[in-house]
Amino acid sequence: MRVTDVVAAGRDQRFQFRPMGLRDALAAHRWRYPGEYAMYNLALEPLLIATLLRGPLSDAAGVSYYAVALDRDPLIGVFSMQHRKGDVEIGVGLRPDLNGRSLGLPYLLEGLELARARYHPQTFSLTVATFNQRAITVYTRAGFIPGPLKSFTYQGKHYDEMTMRRPA
């Protein structure tokens, strides 16, 4: 499968989305997020298992995984999408050392364009931990609207997460 090149509007940045392969999954699996963000370390395990068992592109639940490169940096993030009944649920991960560098919004918008071109959905949705205000700010700027909250426990600690949606 060919690499999909996308250029962030108004920037010199060039994002490339490619089907997730084993090398990318292993590299992303080694990322370590600090503090309470460490809960996102676990989120990469299904990605690794999926690529080991089924090869690139998708897992058994129909989630498509992409490795994202930027300019000469071969792996700045992971992006997932799952199409269900007119909605595409996305997952967005940025390499820990790149957080806070104003990459989130252009990266997210380009990922949404890829999902829109692939599935022609009516809506996009995502789930985010409520403590992750940096991500929530990016998602809000991209037009996502906060929705229902759900509680969960990770390593004995209580968290809330919310689903956010926006029209495609």
What spans do the regions from the language model cover?
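Class I (Rossmann-like) S-adenosyl-L-methionine-dependent methyltransferase catalytic domain
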Residues: 2-3, 34, 44, 151
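C-terminal "cap" of GNAT-fold acetyltransferases
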Residues: 121-136, 141-168
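Acetyl-CoA-dependent GNAT
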Residues: 19-23, 30-91, 95-99, 108, ...
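Conserved beta-strand core positions
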Residues: 15, 88-90, 124
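Conserved glycine-rich acetyl-CoA-binding loop
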Residues: 92-109, 129-137, 141
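Short secondary-structure boundary/capping segments
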Residues: 6-9, 56-58, 79-80, 153-154
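Conserved N-terminal entry element of GNAT/NAT acetyltransferase domains
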Residues: 1-26, 30, 168
